[in-house]
Protein backbone atom coordinates (compact mmCIF):
# COMPACT_ATOMS: atom_id res chain seq x y z
CA UNK A 1 0.00 0.00 0.00
CA UNK A 2 1.16 3.55 -0.77
CA UNK A 3 1.54 6.12 1.98
CA UNK A 4 -0.80 9.08 1.69
CA UNK A 5 0.40 12.67 1.91
CA UNK A 6 -2.48 14.13 3.91
CA UNK A 7 -5.39 12.74 5.88
CA UNK A 8 -8.29 15.06 6.72
CA UNK A 9 -10.52 13.75 9.50
CA UNK A 10 -13.76 14.72 11.22
CA UNK A 11 -14.89 17.03 8.42
CA UNK A 12 -18.22 18.10 7.03
CA UNK A 13 -18.22 18.11 3.23
CA UNK A 14 -20.64 18.61 0.35
CA UNK A 15 -21.42 16.27 -2.51
CA UNK A 16 -21.74 17.27 -6.16
CA UNK A 17 -25.37 18.33 -5.62
CA UNK A 18 -24.37 20.59 -2.72
CA UNK A 19 -25.82 18.43 0.05
CA UNK A 20 -23.88 18.50 3.31
CA UNK A 21 -22.33 15.30 4.68
CA UNK A 22 -20.98 14.85 8.21
CA UNK A 23 -18.18 12.77 9.76
CA UNK A 24 -16.19 12.63 6.52
CA UNK A 25 -12.56 11.78 5.81
CA UNK A 26 -10.46 12.72 2.78
CA UNK A 27 -7.20 11.05 1.77
CA UNK A 28 -4.83 13.00 -0.48
CA UNK A 29 -1.92 11.56 -2.43
CA UNK A 30 0.20 13.20 -5.12
CA UNK A 31 -2.15 16.15 -5.44
CA UNK A 32 -5.29 14.12 -5.95
CA UNK A 33 -8.03 12.60 -3.83
CA UNK A 34 -7.10 8.99 -3.12
CA UNK A 35 -10.12 8.16 -0.95
CA UNK A 36 -13.11 9.98 0.53
CA UNK A 37 -16.16 8.97 2.48
CA UNK A 38 -17.54 8.35 5.93
CA UNK A 39 -14.75 8.26 8.49
CA UNK A 40 -16.03 5.02 10.02
CA UNK A 41 -15.33 3.33 6.66
CA UNK A 42 -11.78 4.69 6.31
CA UNK A 43 -9.36 1.84 5.50
CA UNK A 44 -6.91 1.31 8.35
CA UNK A 45 -3.79 1.55 6.20
CA UNK A 46 -4.53 5.21 5.44
CA UNK A 47 -4.64 5.95 9.16
CA UNK A 48 -1.34 4.15 9.63
CA UNK A 49 0.57 5.54 6.65
CA UNK A 50 -0.50 9.20 6.56
CA UNK A 51 2.41 11.63 6.52
CA UNK A 52 0.17 14.38 7.90
CA UNK A 53 -3.18 14.39 9.69
CA UNK A 54 -5.62 17.23 10.29
CA UNK A 55 -8.61 17.07 12.61
CA UNK A 56 -11.17 19.42 11.08
CA UNK A 57 -13.35 19.45 14.22
CA UNK A 58 -16.55 19.13 12.20
CA UNK A 59 -15.80 22.20 10.10
CA UNK A 60 -16.88 22.42 6.47
CA UNK A 61 -14.67 21.41 3.56
CA UNK A 62 -15.83 22.27 0.06
CA UNK A 63 -14.16 21.80 -3.30
CA UNK A 64 -12.16 24.83 -4.37
CA UNK A 65 -14.63 27.42 -5.60
CA UNK A 66 -14.80 28.10 -9.35
CA UNK A 67 -15.62 31.45 -10.95
CA UNK A 68 -16.62 30.31 -14.42
CA UNK A 69 -17.43 33.68 -16.07
CA UNK A 70 -15.24 36.77 -15.63
CA UNK A 71 -13.81 39.68 -17.61
CA UNK A 72 -11.01 40.28 -15.09
CA UNK A 73 -8.42 41.68 -17.49
CA UNK A 74 -8.97 45.34 -18.32
CA UNK A 75 -7.49 48.76 -17.66
CA UNK A 76 -9.07 51.69 -15.87
CA UNK A 77 -12.58 51.82 -14.44
CA UNK A 78 -15.93 53.48 -15.13
CA UNK A 79 -16.73 55.02 -11.77
CA UNK A 80 -17.35 58.41 -13.41
CA UNK A 81 -20.03 56.81 -15.58
CA UNK A 82 -21.60 55.34 -12.46
CA UNK A 83 -21.91 58.83 -11.03
CA UNK A 84 -23.62 59.98 -14.23
CA UNK A 85 -26.01 57.02 -14.13
CA UNK A 86 -27.02 57.95 -10.60
CA UNK A 87 -27.75 61.44 -11.90
CA UNK A 88 -30.13 59.99 -14.49
CA UNK A 89 -27.93 60.12 -17.60
CA UNK A 90 -28.84 57.27 -19.98
CA UNK A 91 -26.40 54.63 -21.17
CA UNK A 92 -26.96 55.82 -24.74
CA UNK A 93 -25.91 59.35 -23.83
CA UNK A 94 -22.90 58.04 -21.90
CA UNK A 95 -21.85 55.99 -24.93
CA UNK A 96 -22.28 58.97 -27.27
CA UNK A 97 -19.92 60.99 -25.10
CA UNK A 98 -17.22 58.33 -25.39
CA UNK A 99 -18.17 56.16 -22.45
CA UNK A 100 -19.44 52.61 -22.25
CA UNK A 101 -17.54 49.54 -23.36
CA UNK A 102 -15.47 51.42 -25.93
CA UNK A 103 -13.95 53.56 -23.18
CA UNK A 104 -12.68 50.37 -21.54
CA UNK A 105 -11.47 49.18 -24.94
CA UNK A 106 -9.43 52.36 -25.39
CA UNK A 107 -7.91 52.19 -21.90
CA UNK A 108 -7.09 48.50 -22.36
CA UNK A 109 -5.50 49.11 -25.74
CA UNK A 110 -3.40 51.92 -24.30
CA UNK A 111 -2.13 49.75 -21.43
CA UNK A 112 0.99 47.62 -21.71
CA UNK A 113 0.94 43.99 -20.62
CA UNK A 114 2.75 45.01 -17.45
CA UNK A 115 0.13 47.67 -16.69
CA UNK A 116 -2.70 45.22 -17.32
CA UNK A 117 -1.09 42.73 -14.95
CA UNK A 118 -0.62 45.42 -12.30
CA UNK A 119 -4.30 46.39 -12.47
CA UNK A 120 -5.81 42.92 -12.92
CA UNK A 121 -3.76 40.84 -10.49
CA UNK A 122 -5.41 42.33 -7.36
CA UNK A 123 -8.81 41.31 -8.74
CA UNK A 124 -7.67 37.72 -9.18
CA UNK A 125 -6.06 37.67 -5.74
CA UNK A 126 -9.31 38.94 -4.22
CA UNK A 127 -11.10 35.91 -5.66
CA UNK A 128 -8.34 33.61 -4.44
CA UNK A 129 -8.76 35.09 -0.97
CA UNK A 130 -12.35 33.79 -0.98
CA UNK A 131 -11.34 30.21 -1.74
CA UNK A 132 -11.56 30.42 -5.53
CA UNK A 133 -9.03 28.04 -7.08
CA UNK A 134 -10.15 28.12 -10.73
CA UNK A 135 -11.16 31.20 -12.74
CA UNK A 136 -12.30 31.69 -16.32
CA UNK A 137 -11.05 34.94 -17.87
CA UNK A 138 -12.38 36.31 -21.16
CA UNK A 139 -10.82 38.69 -23.62
CA UNK A 140 -13.13 41.21 -25.30
CA UNK A 141 -11.72 44.66 -24.49
CA UNK A 142 -9.14 44.62 -27.27
CA UNK A 143 -11.39 44.07 -30.30
CA UNK A 144 -8.42 43.85 -32.64
CA UNK A 145 -5.83 41.16 -33.23
CA UNK A 146 -2.96 42.67 -31.25
CA UNK A 147 -4.94 43.58 -28.15
CA UNK A 148 -7.14 40.50 -27.94
CA UNK A 149 -3.99 38.37 -27.94
CA UNK A 150 -2.45 40.72 -25.38
CA UNK A 151 -5.39 40.19 -23.04
CA UNK A 152 -5.20 36.41 -23.37
CA UNK A 153 -1.45 36.42 -22.69
CA UNK A 154 -2.02 38.51 -19.58
CA UNK A 155 -4.73 36.13 -18.39
CA UNK A 156 -2.34 33.20 -18.69
CA UNK A 157 0.37 35.10 -16.79
CA UNK A 158 -2.04 36.08 -14.03
CA UNK A 159 -2.84 32.45 -13.31
CA UNK A 160 0.84 31.62 -12.94
CA UNK A 161 1.50 34.64 -10.73
CA UNK A 162 -1.50 34.12 -8.45
CA UNK A 163 -1.30 30.34 -8.18
CA UNK A 164 -4.84 30.06 -9.52
CA UNK A 165 -5.94 27.78 -12.35
CA UNK A 166 -7.02 30.06 -15.22
CA UNK A 167 -9.05 29.02 -18.26
CA UNK A 168 -9.07 31.58 -21.06
CA UNK A 169 -11.97 32.38 -23.36
CA UNK A 170 -11.67 34.33 -26.61
CA UNK A 171 -14.46 36.94 -26.66
CA UNK A 172 -13.50 39.03 -29.64
CA UNK A 173 -17.24 39.06 -30.36
CA UNK A 174 -17.97 41.23 -27.31
CA UNK A 175 -18.60 44.34 -29.39
CA UNK A 176 -17.67 45.55 -32.87
CA UNK A 177 -14.14 46.91 -33.05
CA UNK A 178 -14.19 50.70 -33.47
CA UNK A 179 -12.28 50.44 -36.75
CA UNK A 180 -15.28 48.54 -38.16
CA UNK A 181 -17.99 50.91 -36.95
CA UNK A 182 -21.06 50.52 -39.16
CA UNK A 183 -19.78 47.28 -40.71
CA UNK A 184 -20.16 44.53 -38.15
CA UNK A 185 -20.03 41.78 -40.77
CA UNK A 186 -16.57 42.86 -41.92
CA UNK A 187 -15.47 42.67 -38.29
CA UNK A 188 -16.90 39.17 -37.90
CA UNK A 189 -15.13 38.07 -41.08
CA UNK A 190 -11.84 39.47 -39.75
CA UNK A 191 -12.43 37.78 -36.40
CA UNK A 192 -13.03 34.40 -38.05
CA UNK A 193 -10.26 34.66 -40.62
CA UNK A 194 -7.50 36.27 -38.55
CA UNK A 195 -8.12 36.75 -34.85
CA UNK A 196 -9.53 33.40 -33.79
CA UNK A 197 -7.03 31.26 -35.76
CA UNK A 198 -4.17 33.30 -34.25
CA UNK A 199 -5.47 32.75 -30.72
CA UNK A 200 -5.73 29.03 -31.43
CA UNK A 201 -2.30 28.76 -33.05
CA UNK A 202 -0.66 30.50 -30.08
CA UNK A 203 -2.52 28.25 -27.64
CA UNK A 204 -4.02 31.27 -25.91
CA UNK A 205 -7.71 30.33 -25.99
CA UNK A 206 -9.38 27.41 -24.22
CA UNK A 207 -12.87 28.32 -25.49
CA UNK A 208 -14.77 30.84 -27.64
CA UNK A 209 -17.64 33.08 -26.54
CA UNK A 210 -20.05 35.38 -28.41
CA UNK A 211 -22.33 38.14 -27.13
CA UNK A 212 -25.43 37.39 -29.20
CA UNK A 213 -27.89 40.27 -28.80
CA UNK A 214 -29.54 43.03 -30.82
CA UNK A 215 -26.92 45.51 -29.57
CA UNK A 216 -24.05 43.13 -30.35
CA UNK A 217 -23.97 40.21 -32.82
CA UNK A 218 -26.78 38.55 -34.75
CA UNK A 219 -27.72 34.88 -34.78
CA UNK A 220 -26.19 34.51 -38.23
CA UNK A 221 -22.94 36.14 -37.13
CA UNK A 222 -22.83 34.04 -33.96
CA UNK A 223 -23.23 30.89 -36.04
CA UNK A 224 -20.36 31.94 -38.30
CA UNK A 225 -18.12 32.35 -35.25
CA UNK A 226 -19.30 29.07 -33.68
CA UNK A 227 -18.58 27.22 -36.92
CA UNK A 228 -15.08 28.70 -37.02
CA UNK A 229 -14.53 27.63 -33.42
CA UNK A 230 -15.77 24.14 -34.24
CA UNK A 231 -13.40 23.94 -37.21
CA UNK A 232 -10.56 24.91 -34.85
CA UNK A 233 -11.68 22.31 -32.30
CA UNK A 234 -12.42 24.94 -29.65
CA UNK A 235 -15.44 24.56 -27.34
CA UNK A 236 -17.97 27.37 -27.28
CA UNK A 237 -19.90 29.45 -24.78
CA UNK A 238 -22.52 32.13 -25.35
CA UNK A 239 -23.78 35.34 -23.75
CA UNK A 240 -27.41 34.46 -24.50
CA UNK A 241 -30.92 35.86 -23.93
CA UNK A 242 -29.73 38.59 -21.56
CA UNK A 243 -31.79 41.47 -22.95
CA UNK A 244 -34.16 39.64 -25.31
CA UNK A 245 -34.91 36.16 -26.60
CA UNK A 246 -33.01 35.80 -29.87
CA UNK A 247 -32.72 32.03 -29.82
CA UNK A 248 -29.00 32.20 -29.06
CA UNK A 249 -29.23 29.43 -26.48
CA UNK A 250 -30.72 27.03 -29.03
CA UNK A 251 -28.05 27.95 -31.56
CA UNK A 252 -25.27 27.49 -29.02
CA UNK A 253 -26.76 24.17 -27.94
CA UNK A 254 -26.70 22.99 -31.54
CA UNK A 255 -22.95 23.58 -31.51
CA UNK A 256 -22.51 21.69 -28.24
CA UNK A 257 -21.97 24.72 -26.01
CA UNK A 258 -20.39 24.19 -22.61
CA UNK A 259 -22.61 26.93 -21.23
CA UNK A 260 -25.10 29.65 -22.01
CA UNK A 261 -24.75 32.66 -19.72
CA UNK A 262 -27.13 35.35 -18.36
CA UNK A 263 -30.40 33.84 -19.74
CA UNK A 264 -32.91 36.29 -18.25
CA UNK A 265 -35.14 35.90 -21.33
CA UNK A 266 -34.63 32.16 -21.89
CA UNK A 267 -37.78 30.29 -22.97
CA UNK A 268 -38.75 26.63 -22.68
CA UNK A 269 -37.54 25.74 -26.16
CA UNK A 270 -34.11 27.16 -25.42
CA UNK A 271 -33.97 25.37 -22.08
CA UNK A 272 -34.91 22.04 -23.65
CA UNK A 273 -32.23 22.45 -26.30
CA UNK A 274 -29.70 23.18 -23.56
CA UNK A 275 -30.68 19.91 -21.86
CA UNK A 276 -30.05 18.00 -25.09
CA UNK A 277 -26.60 19.58 -25.38
CA UNK A 278 -25.81 19.08 -21.68
CA UNK A 279 -25.08 22.82 -21.52
CA UNK A 280 -24.87 24.61 -18.18
CA UNK A 281 -26.85 27.76 -17.38
CA UNK A 282 -24.43 30.30 -15.89
CA UNK A 283 -26.40 32.83 -13.86
CA UNK A 284 -24.87 36.22 -13.09
CA UNK A 285 -26.58 37.95 -10.15
CA UNK A 286 -24.00 40.75 -10.03
CA UNK A 287 -25.04 42.05 -13.46
CA UNK A 288 -28.71 41.56 -12.55
CA UNK A 289 -28.18 43.76 -9.48
CA UNK A 290 -25.93 46.43 -10.97
CA UNK A 291 -28.07 46.94 -14.09
CA UNK A 292 -31.25 47.01 -11.98
CA UNK A 293 -32.80 44.36 -14.18
CA UNK A 294 -36.41 43.34 -13.64
CA UNK A 295 -36.46 40.07 -15.58
CA UNK A 296 -34.98 37.21 -13.58
CA UNK A 297 -33.53 34.09 -15.20
CA UNK A 298 -36.17 31.32 -15.22
CA UNK A 299 -34.75 29.24 -12.37
CA UNK A 300 -37.95 27.19 -11.95
CA UNK A 301 -37.89 26.28 -15.65
CA UNK A 302 -34.22 25.32 -15.48
CA UNK A 303 -34.98 23.08 -12.50
CA UNK A 304 -37.99 21.46 -14.15
CA UNK A 305 -36.23 20.52 -17.38
CA UNK A 306 -32.96 19.58 -15.68
CA UNK A 307 -30.47 22.23 -16.78
CA UNK A 308 -27.55 22.50 -14.35
CA UNK A 309 -27.10 25.99 -12.91
CA UNK A 310 -23.76 27.65 -12.20
CA UNK A 311 -23.12 31.05 -10.62
CA UNK A 312 -20.28 33.43 -11.46
CA UNK A 313 -19.20 37.00 -10.72
CA UNK A 314 -19.19 38.28 -14.33
CA UNK A 315 -16.50 40.56 -12.91
CA UNK A 316 -16.22 43.48 -15.35
CA UNK A 317 -16.05 47.30 -15.23
CA UNK A 318 -19.39 47.99 -16.89
CA UNK A 319 -22.10 45.78 -15.45
CA UNK A 320 -20.67 43.76 -12.55
CA UNK A 321 -17.71 45.49 -10.87
CA UNK A 322 -17.22 42.87 -8.18
CA UNK A 323 -14.55 40.39 -7.16
CA UNK A 324 -16.65 38.50 -4.61
CA UNK A 325 -18.03 35.10 -5.55
CA UNK A 326 -19.27 34.74 -1.96
CA UNK A 327 -21.44 37.82 -2.43
CA UNK A 328 -22.82 36.32 -5.65
CA UNK A 329 -23.77 33.20 -3.71
CA UNK A 330 -25.81 35.27 -1.27
CA UNK A 331 -27.40 37.23 -4.12
CA UNK A 332 -28.33 34.05 -5.98
CA UNK A 333 -30.14 32.66 -2.96
CA UNK A 334 -31.97 35.95 -2.34
CA UNK A 335 -32.65 37.28 -5.85
CA UNK A 336 -33.09 33.98 -7.71
CA UNK A 337 -34.51 31.84 -4.86
CA UNK A 338 -31.87 29.17 -5.30
CA UNK A 339 -31.53 26.67 -2.46
CA UNK A 340 -28.36 26.34 -0.39
CA UNK A 341 -27.36 23.04 -2.09
CA UNK A 342 -28.08 24.54 -5.53
CA UNK A 343 -25.84 27.53 -4.78
CA UNK A 344 -23.01 25.40 -3.41
CA UNK A 345 -23.14 23.09 -6.42
CA UNK A 346 -23.34 26.15 -8.69
CA UNK A 347 -19.90 27.40 -7.64
CA UNK A 348 -18.26 23.97 -7.58
CA UNK A 349 -19.54 21.05 -9.66
CA UNK A 350 -21.80 22.93 -12.09
CA UNK A 351 -19.15 25.61 -12.57
CA UNK A 352 -16.62 22.90 -13.44
CA UNK A 353 -19.04 21.57 -16.06
CA UNK A 354 -19.37 25.07 -17.52
CA UNK A 355 -15.61 24.95 -18.16
CA UNK A 356 -15.54 21.34 -19.35
CA UNK A 357 -13.40 20.39 -16.33
CA UNK A 358 -15.77 18.21 -14.31
CA UNK A 359 -13.51 15.15 -14.67
CA UNK A 360 -10.74 16.91 -12.74
CA UNK A 361 -12.25 19.49 -10.38
CA UNK A 362 -15.53 20.67 -8.86
CA UNK A 363 -16.38 17.87 -6.44
CA UNK A 364 -14.79 15.79 -3.71
CA UNK A 365 -14.42 12.46 -5.50
CA UNK A 366 -11.71 9.85 -5.87
CA UNK A 367 -9.26 10.69 -8.65
CA UNK A 368 -10.00 14.39 -8.80
CA UNK A 369 -7.46 17.13 -8.16
CA UNK A 370 -7.29 17.99 -4.45
CA UNK A 371 -8.54 21.58 -4.64
CA UNK A 372 -10.22 22.03 -1.25
CA UNK A 373 -11.32 24.84 1.05
CA UNK A 374 -11.55 24.47 4.83
CA UNK A 375 -14.01 26.96 6.34
CA UNK A 376 -14.34 28.06 9.97
CA UNK A 377 -18.02 27.09 9.94
CA UNK A 378 -19.95 23.87 10.42
CA UNK A 379 -23.20 24.74 8.60
CA UNK A 380 -22.89 25.17 4.82
CA UNK A 381 -25.83 27.60 4.84
CA UNK A 382 -23.52 30.19 6.40
CA UNK A 383 -21.77 30.65 3.05
CA UNK A 384 -25.00 32.09 1.63
CA UNK A 385 -26.35 33.61 4.84
CA UNK A 386 -23.45 36.04 5.26
CA UNK A 387 -22.58 38.73 2.70
CA UNK A 388 -19.09 37.95 1.33
CA UNK A 389 -18.11 36.20 4.55
CA UNK A 390 -16.59 34.09 6.09
CA UNK A 391 -13.23 33.88 4.38
CA UNK A 392 -11.59 30.45 4.20
CA UNK A 393 -9.57 29.14 7.11
CA UNK A 394 -7.27 27.33 4.65
CA UNK A 395 -7.20 26.67 0.91
CA UNK A 396 -5.57 23.69 -0.79
CA UNK A 397 -4.58 23.68 -4.46
CA UNK A 398 -3.56 20.35 -6.01
CA UNK A 399 -2.81 18.86 -2.61
CA UNK A 400 -0.80 21.80 -1.23
CA UNK A 401 -2.06 24.23 1.40
CA UNK A 402 -1.61 27.72 -0.07
CA UNK A 403 -3.17 29.80 2.71
UniProtKB/Swiss-Prot annotation:
Residues that bind Fe(3+): 69, 71, 239, 314
Cofactor note: Binds 1 zinc or iron ion per subunit.
Alphabetized UniProt keyword annotations: Cytoplasm, Histidine metabolism, Hydrolase, Iron, Metal-binding, Zinc
One matching Pfam family: Amidohydro_1
InterPro entries per UniProt: Amidohydro-rel, HutI, Metal-dep_hydrolase_composite, Metal_Hydrolase
One Gene Ontology cellular component: cytoplasm
Cofactor(s) needed for function: Zn(2+); Fe(3+)
PANTHER family for the chain: IMIDAZOLONEPROPIONASE (PTHR42752), IMIDAZOLONEPROPIONASE-RELATED (PTHR42752:SF1)
Name of the protein in question: Imidazolonepropionase
Organism: Legionella pneumophila subsp. pneumophila (strain Philadelphia 1 / ATCC 33152 / DSM 7513)
